[in-house]
Amino acid sequence: MAIKRGTLVRAIREKLEGSLEAQASDPFIPNYVFETPGEVVDIKGDYLQIKFGAVPTPTVWLRADQVQEMAG
């Protein structure tokens, strides 16, 4: 199934850590990125803009292959 706006996703640690996207930002990736669901709020090509968690945090752009759709 294709990921679309509103889809809940979770980051895949093995694909995100050490990636170009991770190197372009703070090297410490907070656990909430891997442990909480994120909502896809925009899509541009192979990249997804994702809002993680219920607390106010900035959105992040990740490649579609760095996340997995959550069941449910």
Curated annotation (Swiss-Prot):
- Keywords for the protein's UniProt record, in alphabetical order: Membrane, NAD, NADP, Plastoquinone, Quinone, Thylakoid, Translocase, Transport
Catalytic reaction list: a plastoquinone + NADH + (n+1) H(+)(in) = a plastoquinol + NAD(+) + n H(+)(out); a plastoquinone + NADPH + (n+1) H(+)(in) = a plastoquinol + NADP(+) + n H(+)(out)
User: Disulphide bridges in this chain?
Assistant: none
GO function term, MF aspect, one? oxidoreductase activity, acting on NAD(P)H, quinone or similar compound as acceptor
Q: What is this protein called?
A: NAD(P)H-quinone oxidoreductase subunit O
Pfam families linked: NdhO
Q: Which GO terms describe its cellular component?
A: plasma membrane-derived thylakoid membrane
UniProt function note = NDH-1 shuttles electrons from an unknown electron donor, via FMN and iron-sulfur (Fe-S) centers, to quinones in the respiratory and/or the photosynthetic chain. The immediate electron acceptor for the enzyme in this species is believed to be plastoquinone. Couples the redox reaction to proton translocation, and thus conserves the redox energy in a proton gradient. Cyanobacterial NDH-1 also plays a role in inorganic carbon-concentration.
Q: What class of enzyme is it?
A: translocase
User: Subunit comment for this entry?
Assistant: NDH-1 can be composed of about 15 different subunits; different subcomplexes with different compositions have been identified which probably have different functions.
Localization, UniProt: Cellular thylakoid membrane
Which EC numbers does the record give?
7.1.1.-
Q: How does it sit in the membrane?
A: Peripheral membrane protein
Tell me which InterPro entries the record gives.
NdhO
Q: Which family does it belong to?
A: Belongs to the complex I NdhO subunit family.
